[in-house]
Amino acid sequence: MTHYPKITPETPFDAVIVANGAFPKHETLLRILHHAPHVIACDGAAKTLLDAGFTAQQMTVIGDGDSLAPRLKRQLHFISISEQDDNDLTKATRYVCTQHGPAQPQLTANRRLRIAYLGATGKREDHTLGNIALMMHCYDHFNVQPFMLTDEGIFIAACGDCRFDLTPGQQVSLFNFGCQQLESQGLRWPIYPFDALWQGTLNEAVQPIIQIKADNAYLVYITWTFY
């Protein structure tokens, strides 16, 4: 059973990818960003990071460069990827995977790359929906464990039997991505193999640990407790 402890400012991530959506405001998320061993900015997010006090040397920038001025690109560690089949978030994820490849054998099926995604929601709604859905694609195809962090909560891609450390009263939503078996312990309302995305929303933890029993993949959303 996979265990997901609570996310704190000290939670370790292999990399933090910053998209060009709503930049985080809460101190917990900003501390996670500042503690990151590797920060990757998706194209225009580089300017946001610079405005927030980061230096060009603290980040790698991935994208086609269409939203960055030439002068700014020359200052940055900019990796141009011009193909349009994937969005910048996918390109950044693939780049992180290439940096943690065969030379690091400790990364196996039991040790996925832990990537935190910031700035992936807000602004345009179509980008938000696409980025949230992309978490499952990253989990399935890149052998990463994605965590999408926003000022309101966190999305976690998961599969199979898992347990999550929570605080009773935290709001929980669960989105089914192929489960024929889907059960829970520790939630106010029982879950089942939902066939529509809205059906698993607006649940609540009633115990400090919730357990999910499943036979396939699902996406969990958990609200923060720091408000």
Q: Which role does the model predict for each range below?
A:
Residues 6-11, 30-34, 54, 72, ...:
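Solvent-exposed alpha-helices and their adjacent loops that cap or buttress functional pockets
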Residues 19-22, 120-121, 223-224:
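Structural motif
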Residues 48-52, 95-99, 137:
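A generic secondary-structure signal
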Residues 25-27, 48, 88-90, 124-129:
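Short glycine/serine/threonine-rich phosphate/pyrophosphate-binding segments
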Residues 151, 158-227:
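Long, charged alpha-helical interface segments
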Residues 112-162:
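Anionic-ligand-binding alpha/beta catalytic cores of soluble enzymes and soluble regulatory domains
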Residues 1-73:
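N-terminal beta-strand-loop-alpha-helix module at the start
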Residues 76-107:
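Short phosphate-binding loop-to-helix
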